Amino acid sequence: GSSDLSLTVGATDDLNTVNREDDTIAGYSSRGPRADNSDGNPLNELKPEISAPGSNIIQAEGCVTSGLCSNLLGDAADNGYTGGGSGTSYATPSVSGIMALMLEANPDLSPAEIKEIIKLTAERRGEATQPDVDPFWNRDFGWGMADAYEATKMSFLLKEQELTGAVDVFT
């Protein structure tokens, strides 16, 4: 999604560890910025905007008709009813899930507010690539790795405090 209004998601690779500090941007994930669309707003060119896990993701496999389900315990790679894959198409659903949590916490959020909250609450990664345009955006990770807890918490706090309007990404 390179559209101005879309939230573009990059994929990270956890290097098969539980330690998020060693996560890297996946080699197949697009880097930014996107090509200038001549709209006069350099912030629109800062894509991707967020990153999320997208490498070696375990997924459920449909096995009712294939007969491959064996309900084995142990390594998920060998049980016949799960599979795995990698790609930004694996990273994007987790960000969609975060958006759902945010809307559960605060149904009054606008699409623009959701996008800004996700960017604001992201776990920052890498040095700012274009600090003259934005002090946090990085060409690999966007504004950072999506943080479901912080994004949902901010959504709830905005609802609880009856705050509306734009989120200031500089504070």
What positions do the PLM features span?
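Conserved active-site and cofactor/substrate-binding residues in soluble primary-metabolism enzymes
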Residues: D4, D23, E45, Y90-P93, ...
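Short capping/connector residues at structural and topological boundaries
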Residues: S30-R34, G62, A146, E150-A151
